[in-house]
């Protein structure tokens, strides 16, 4: 089956369910999301971009003024609004999985964990000028601490894709292949509501 046929089959079987990309900072969710969305004829939303637009503040400014708890409250509100829509690929913030109430929304769609190799993730984060409030000071130790804390939660994802140096296009194809396998399983997403256009 060629890639186009695979994407068409997956899109049909998804029935309008949102795809939520989760993973650590620097894993490529925001780079892969638009590519995957285009291949599936889905819309694309980046949760952090929506938060910044709605609050008219950067993520760092929100952390400075509201702290992590305040930021997570805003993030949950935005996720709830996004969850009312369908046929979206959603790039989430790395910590969105840490709030149990978010999982109720995430599992209305399909949760895809992009698991980037640690050294490559750290290399990307070192060269990225985007302020990362939770990775201030000792990048390696803070990254490892966050990953250890989040790993059991990431493992609850519907799809787990380990990646290294692949292009966003290759990651999107890998996601689609995994989705195809998931959706073809009898137990794959039973009980999840599909949305008919």
UniProtKB/Swiss-Prot annotation:
Keywords associated with the record: Amino-acid biosynthesis, Aromatic amino acid biosynthesis, ATP-binding, Cytoplasm, Kinase, Magnesium, Metal-binding, Nucleotide-binding, Transferase
One Pfam assignment: SKI
InterPro entries per UniProt: P-loop_NTPase, Shikimate/glucono_kinase, Shikimate_kinase/TSH1, Shikimate_kinase_CS
Compartment annotation: Cytoplasm
Cofactor(s) the protein requires to work: Mg(2+)
Biological process (GO), any one: aromatic amino acid family biosynthetic process
Entry's EC annotation: 2.7.1.71
Species this protein is from: Prochlorococcus marinus (strain MIT 9211)
Protein name, as recorded: Shikimate kinase
Gene: aroK
């Amino acid at each position: 089956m060629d890639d186009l046929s695979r994407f068409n089959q997956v899109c049909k079987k998804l029935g309008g369910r949102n795809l939520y990309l989760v993973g650590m900072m620097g894993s490529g969710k925001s780079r892969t999301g638009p590519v995957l969305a285009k291949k599936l004829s889905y819309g694309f939303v980046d949760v952090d971009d929506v938060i910044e637009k709605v609050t008219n503040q950067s993520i760092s400014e929100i952390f400075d003024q509201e702290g992590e708890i305040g930021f997570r409250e805003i993030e949950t509100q935005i996720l709830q609004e996004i969850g009312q829509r369908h046929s979206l690929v959603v790039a989430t913030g790395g910590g969105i999985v840490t709030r149990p109430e978010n999982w109720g929304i995430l599992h209305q769609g399909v949760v895809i964990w992009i698991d980037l190799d640690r050294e490559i993730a750290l290399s990307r984060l070192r060269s990225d000028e985007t302020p990362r409030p939770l990775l201030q000071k000792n990048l390696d130790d803070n990254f490892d601490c966050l990953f250890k804390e989040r790993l059991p939660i990431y493992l609850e994802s519907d799809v787990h894709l380990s990646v290294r140096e692949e292009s966003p296009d290759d990651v999107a194809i890998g996601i689609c292949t995994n989705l195809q396998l998931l959706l073809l399983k009898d137990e794959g997403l039973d009980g999840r509501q599909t949305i008919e256009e």
